Swiss-Prot record:
Native source species: Mycobacterium tuberculosis (strain ATCC 25618 / H37Rv)
Residue ranges, Extracellular side: 44-68
Entry's localization field: Cell membrane
Transmembrane segments: 15-43, 69-89
Gene Ontology cellular-component annotations: membrane; plasma membrane
Miscellaneous comment as given in the Swiss-Prot or TrEMBL entry: E.coli inner membranes are often used to measure the activity of heterologously expressed channels, but the lipid composition of E.coli membranes differs considerably from that of M.tuberculosis. Phosphatidylinositol is one of the major constituents of M.tuberculosis membranes, but not of E.coli membranes, and this affects channel activity.
Similarity-based family: Belongs to the MscL family.
Protein name as catalogued: Large-conductance mechanosensitive channel
InterPro entries attached to this UniProt entry: Mechanosensitive_channel_CS, MS_channel, MSC/AndL, MscL_channel
Length: 151
């Protein structure tokens, strides 16, 4: 049981996921501190009345209490900064590398041979039109039969 768990943890996907979570958590903390220390104070100063310290995004509701929309706006900016960075620094490069790495796989030889057998059987049993190798069916492009029919 312990061996199976060790193999599960040693797989590449699990290790990659663990690294991504650690880096993502650290990056989130960095962006949150940036937003809290730089963006939020700038947003707090938008439309502030010098006498009451209540502005466009901080609405006084009486009794010295306010509805502070600055916190919500800061959280939204925080989210969009993280989403932007993750998309352009992780997702986009990963997708381009994955597309470059995709190589067209040659057809499975067993499938090619079975297709040729099916076509031969259809021809010997009578010309049936359609998928089963009738008169309108083109010659195979792969496999042993393709080289003999092209000669």
């Amino acid at each position: 049981m312990l061996k199976g768990f060790k193999e599960f943890l040693a797989r590449g996907n699990i290790v990659d996921l663990a690294v991504a979570v650690v880096i993502g958590t650290a990056f989130t903390a960095l962006v949150t501190k940036f937003t809290d220390s730089i963006i939020t104070p700038l947003i707090n100063r938008i439309g502030v009345n010098a006498q009451s310290d209540v502005g466009i995004l901080r609405i006084g509701i009486g009794g010295g209490q306010t509805i502070d929309l600055n916190v919500l706006l800061s959280a939204a900016i925080n989210f969009f900064l993280i989403a932007f960075a993750v998309y352009f620094l992780v997702v986009l490069p990963y997708n381009t590398l994955r597309k470059k790495g995709e190589v067209e796989q040659p057809g499975d030889t067993q499938v090619v041979l079975l297709t040729e057998i099916r076509d031969l059987l259809a021809q010997t049993n009578g010309d049936s039109p359609g998928r089963h190798g009738g008169r309108g069916t083109p010659s195979p492009t792969d496999g042993p039969r393709a080289s003999t029919e092209s000669q």
